[in-house]
Amino acid sequence: MARIAGIDLPRDKRIAIALTYIFGIGRPTADKILAETGINPDTRTRDLTDEEVARLREYIDKNVEVEGDLRREISLNIKRLMEIGCYRGLRHRRGLPVRGQRTKTNARTRKGPARTVAGKKKK
C-alpha cells in the first residue's frame, strides 16, 4: 500500500482517484501531479513501482500544500480575519454564513438547531 503525506492510498483504485484521498488534492491537482511526474493516471495504486511512489512523494512534498500544513494555513487565515475585525471575520466569530447567503430563513447548518422565540405564535 502506497503511503503519501501520511495517508494510506487505497490499493484497488486508479492512482488519479487514489490521490484525492489526500486533503488538499482534488481531481485537477491529481491529474497535474501525474502529468508532471510522468505516471499514467489509469495505473492502479497496487501496480505502482517503488520508484514511481518516490517520485509522487517527492513532487507532492515540494510543490503541493497538503494535510496538516494546509489545515493549519486555513485556520490561521480564518483567525487573522477574526483578529482584524473585518466583516468576514465577524461572521466567522458569530457562526453565521460568511459568503452573503440569506439568514432570515435557511442557514441552519451554520446557525445550529432552531431556537423558538417566546411570544411568537402563528394565528
Curated annotation (Swiss-Prot):
GO CC list: cytosol; small ribosomal subunit
Transmembrane keyword on record: no
GO BP annotation list: translation
Record has Nucleus as a keyword: no
Keywords, ordered alphabetically: Ribonucleoprotein, Ribosomal protein, RNA-binding, rRNA-binding, tRNA-binding
Region annotation (Disordered) ranges: 95-123
UniProt-listed Pfam families: Ribosomal_S13
Entry GO MF terms: rRNA binding; structural constituent of ribosome; tRNA binding
Classification via InterPro entries: Rbsml_uS13_C (IPR027437), Ribosomal_uS13 (IPR001892), Ribosomal_uS13-like_H2TH (IPR010979), Ribosomal_uS13_bac-type (IPR019980), Ribosomal_uS13_CS (IPR018269)
Disulfide linkage: none
Entry-linked PROSITE patterns: RIBOSOMAL_S13_1, RIBOSOMAL_S13_2
Function: Located at the top of the head of the 30S subunit, it contacts several helices of the 16S rRNA. In the 70S ribosome it contacts the 23S rRNA (bridge B1a) and protein L5 of the 50S subunit (bridge B1b), connecting the 2 subunits; these bridges are implicated in subunit movement. Contacts the tRNAs in the A and P-sites.
HAMAP family found in the cross-reference section: Ribosomal_uS13
Oligomeric and partner information: Part of the 30S ribosomal subunit. Forms a loose heterodimer with protein S19. Forms two bridges to the 50S subunit in the 70S ribosome.
PANTHER family, sorted: 30S RIBOSOMAL PROTEIN S13/40S RIBOSOMAL PROTEIN S18 (PTHR10871), SMALL RIBOSOMAL SUBUNIT PROTEIN US13M (PTHR10871:SF1)
Entry similarity comment: Belongs to the universal ribosomal protein uS13 family.
Protein name: Small ribosomal subunit protein uS13
Organism: Heliobacterium modesticaldum (strain ATCC 51547 / Ice1)
